[in-house]
């Protein structure tokens, strides 16, 4: 996906100077995986994370969805949200664990964006490599491993999706 096609308020040349990575399953969507996300997506969005996504987009940050699902499964979400980039699983490269961190780092390098200016939102210990790649990690929910890192690193925290949304 072309990450420089939109004019952005944070850089007169139209290039983003910051990025925000959003884990999809269990973070942006209240459902833990896309197979559980039946029916209209609107009721499955996790409102605080969706608000953060729109806030980053308004600032002209590169908005990136990160998911263990494949591109076909993500199609309804990408249609609704129109992210600048999507990092998702391919048959030869699942997007899990360290793969999320590697993919985020590669995208930042490709776009010339400093990691210190970037954000990542994630909900589980397996996402720690993604959170470790940015200057502003945000823990969503109450995963004990992530909460320990959040306390040590003074990371922001957002509440977990409520049970009735899952």
What is the predicted function of each stretch?
Residues 2-22, 41-166:
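C-terminal cap/substrate-recognition subdomain and adjoining C-terminal extension
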Residues 32-38:
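Basic, amphipathic juxtamembrane/active-site segments
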Residues 27-29:
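Hydrophobic "anchor" residues
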């Amino acid at each position: 996906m072309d990450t420089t096609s939109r004019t952005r308020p944070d850089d007169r040349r139209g290039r983003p100077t910051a990025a925000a990575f959003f884990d999809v399953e269990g973070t942006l969507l209240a459902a833990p995986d896309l197979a559980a996300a039946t029916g209209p997506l609107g009721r499955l969005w996790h409102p605080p994370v969706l608000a953060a996504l729109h806030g980053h987009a308004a600032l002209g940050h590169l908005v990136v969805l990160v998911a263990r699902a494949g591109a076909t499964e993500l199609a309804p979400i990408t249609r609704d949200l129109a992210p600048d980039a999507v990092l998702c699983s391919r048959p030869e490269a699942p997007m899990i664990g360290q793969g999320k961190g590697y993919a985020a780092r590669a995208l930042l390098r490709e776009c010339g964006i400093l990691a210190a200016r970037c954000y990542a939102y994630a909900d589980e210990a397996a996402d720690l490599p993604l959170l470790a790649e940015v200057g502003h990690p945000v823990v969503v929910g109450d995963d004990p491993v992530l909460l320990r890192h959040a306390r040590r690193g003074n990371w922001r925290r957002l509440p977990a999706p409520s049970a009735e949304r899952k």
